[in-house]
Amino acid sequence: MTNIRKTHPLLKIVNSSFVDLPAPSSLSSWWNFGSLLGVCLGVQILTGLFLAMHYTSDTATAFNSVTHICRDVNYGWLLRYLHANGASMFFICLYLHVGRGLYYGSYTYSETWNIGILLLFAVMATAFMGYVLPWGQMSFWGATVITNLLSAIPYIGTDLVQWIWGGFSVDKATLTRFFAFHFLLPFIVTALVMVHLLFLHETGSNNPTGIPSDPDMIPFHPYYTIKDILGFLVMLTALAPLVLFSPDLLGDPDNYIPANPSTTPPHIKPEWYFLFAYAILRSIPNKLGGVLALVMSILILAIVPILHVSKQRSMMFRPLSQCLFWFLVAVLFTLTWIGGQPVEHPYIIIGQTASVLYFLIILFLMPMISMVENYLLKW
């Protein structure tokens, strides 16, 4: 008798995706982050669902409802901090996942890569709107500053901002719609994840060497299922101390002050995972230029496949490109640090230098180094 997992209409989809899926035998731990992101998404949806049962999206009660969750709801503090720090873990895994794709040339699967970029934008939008919901000082002013950037768009900018706000300032209407979208977007993200996996399974996984691995494949289960479970345990080991011992480590103290439109915090800044993009935005004196640079800092990933001129897919055997890649990582760390600093000397010039280097490395230096490596291959 044939196994039910291979014949049942629903189970055979799961089987071909997670059980009998042929996978390259050489996948390293860098291939764990896809499954870790799936776990993060699941945790965020579950904790978010329970938080939404107690949260009220009204300017008069939003801040107090979050306090109520932490103080009065059974394990409400755990739900709240799992959700907040789970988002940080989500972005750590996201950035490592994208970095893996850049390093090993996974972007040559252009459909999977482009859906991934769309996913990155969707998750960033979700996180931004979620940060507004506790209705603290940084929530309010962060929402005001970031949405106000759209006013830089010629002709329609001002009308667009007021349309998003639902009035002439960030107020009750803004909070209500942000809550609605924050609730909806994770389900859209889940649908996009399925499309992402669909495109990935059309081509099969890349591997660290970047060489086709068709002759050397192993079944996903049990080899990679057990490896993924180890990944989950490692992530949980990192997340648990953060949530249980220092849950506010990555947050902003200003967000424990209720939103007050008449008092501006000394330094308005987003959550740590947006600081690199925020630094790029601030490094350009022109408002529209800053907004374009902000969008391009992520959208630049879409043109990476076009800029791939190397004869080798992966950076595994390309030491010059490896050096440049890690230099890019250092630039991103610098931008993240600068994004959290006040706008004054010497931070301004450091931010501007790092921003120029970020675009310079991706647009010019990477392709140039690849061409040099191609030339060296002839020797």
UniProtKB/Swiss-Prot annotation:
Heme b b566 binds at residues 97, 196. Heme b b562 binds at residues 83, 182. It holds the Pfam family Cytochrom_B_C. Keywords: Electron transport, Heme, Iron, Membrane, Metal-binding, Mitochondrion, Mitochondrion inner membrane, Respiratory chain, Transmembrane, Transmembrane helix, Transport, Ubiquinone. InterPro entries: Cyt_b/b6_C (IPR005798), Cyt_b/b6_C_sf (IPR036150), Cyt_b/b6_N (IPR005797), Cytb/b6-like_sf (IPR027387), Cytochrome_b (IPR030689), Cytochrome_b_C_euk/bac (IPR048260), Cytochrome_b_N_euk/bac (IPR048259), Di-haem_cyt_TM (IPR016174). It is a multi-pass membrane protein. This is Cytochrome b.
